[in-house]
Amino acid sequence: MATAKKSTAKKSAAKKPATTARAAKTDATVLLQRDHADVKKLFKQYEKLADAEADGEERQALASQICAMLTVHATIEEEIFYPAAREAEVDDDLLDEAEVEHASAKDLIAQIQSMSPDDELYDANVIVLGEYIDHHVQEEEGEMFPKCRRAKMDLAELATALAQRKAELMAEV
């Protein structure tokens, strides 16, 4: 009988969303860095498609995936991570800049979503968005995250909250 209980417990543990389970073993900055790496790969894929003058539907599908991923990522940072960083008195100027960068990215995302992949500047908008995001990521990972690690933030607890909210938002996409 004890064996049956163990296998049932393992099955229910396996049903946890992977991001939530992973978050329990990491900290918030690592979770956010994973998102950064994932979206960077998608931008590289997009550039290859654009260079190869790939089918518009294929480019649009990838651009939509990028936009959705970035929208969810920005939301969890704005709702959870940035307020926690402000509370821990991490550099307010750096956080202000990050929020302005998010606003610029959201504007480009809205432009991309309103365009057709056949529009003259479609590829340019997606590529420029990638460049904006690359700059934003460099500042977060190079300046903000180290300051957050030194501040009195519960990064493990934040990772769990970020992963849960991300799962909720991804379910809506």
Language-model segments: which ranges?
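Small-residue-biased structural context
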Residues: 2-173
